[in-house]
Amino acid sequence: MRCNIWHIKGQEFDLLIDTGMGLSSLKKYILEETSKPIKAIVTHSHFDHCGSLHEFNCRLGHKNEEEILEKTLNDKIVFSGAWKEIEIIDKKQFPEYSGEKYTVTPAPLTGYLDEGDVIDLGSRAFNILHLPGHSPGSIGLLDLKSKELFSGDALYDGELLDNLYHSDPKLYEKTLSRIINLDINIFHGGHFPSFGKNRAKEIINNYFSGQNKIKDVKLWFNKSKGMSKDIFSDQNWDSSIKLISQNEI
């Protein structure tokens, strides 16, 4: 579950969009990159996006995700029983560690983000979009000037997921219908490489035709074990945006 972690540099403070699984200290890594205050934003509350959120003093997200973030994540979120191994952990160095022991530290939000909010970094600004369906409080960050959307798991270049315990397929269909009609040139998803508008339309249309859905989460999880490392990790889009690979930290 290699979540994309985006570090966006600003004039007075930096943004961190999602925080990965929390297998090692993300904050330690970030402090080597910047001395500015960090506003950590979680696009939604799933374990692979909020694992290191607790390390940061400023934790922002949608109020509909708050209840989950306040608790140690349970097996509904981490798919206990489906995931036995964490590939990034060296079994020889840490023989006692297993996926079944994995937990996420509670990280209560210190502030809320919702539709219409704007985060101004000085050099650029992001409009918050509420994109429910994958989860109740999924959000995206849209730069209207550059026409880039950081979409979390509302849209990524892979099989889409709408059947978790708190997913809502009907809302998800509305979200995807909305996204496909937005004026966006580049999509930075919660997983996999970034992509353009034509690919976004293809992904969404395939979803609506039933060809691009994860129908059984645990089966998909087991099938995904042992997949090769993401060759697209550590992407740099410009001087102010860096994609941090989970394999680095």
Which residues does each predicted region cover?
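Active-site neighborhood of phospho(di)ester-bond hydrolases with catalytic His/Asp-centered motifs
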Residues: 16-19, 38-48, 59-63, 130-133, ...
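Active-site HxH/HxHxD metal-binding segment of metal-dependent hydrolases
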Residues: 23-114, 118, 207-216, 220
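Core dinuclear metal-dependent hydrolase active-site scaffold
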Residues: 112-143
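Conserved beta-strand hairpin/beta-sheet module of binuclear metal-dependent hydrolase folds
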Residues: 1-32, 140-156
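Active-site-proximal segments of metal-dependent phosphoesterases and phosphodiesterases across multiple
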Residues: 154-166
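Active-site environment of divalent metal-dependent phosphoester hydrolases
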Residues: 22-25, 45-51, 66, 135-138, ...
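Residue-level signal for the nucleotide or nucleotide-sugar donor/cofactor binding architecture
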Residues: 51, 126, 167
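Accessory terminal helices/loops
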Residues: 173-249
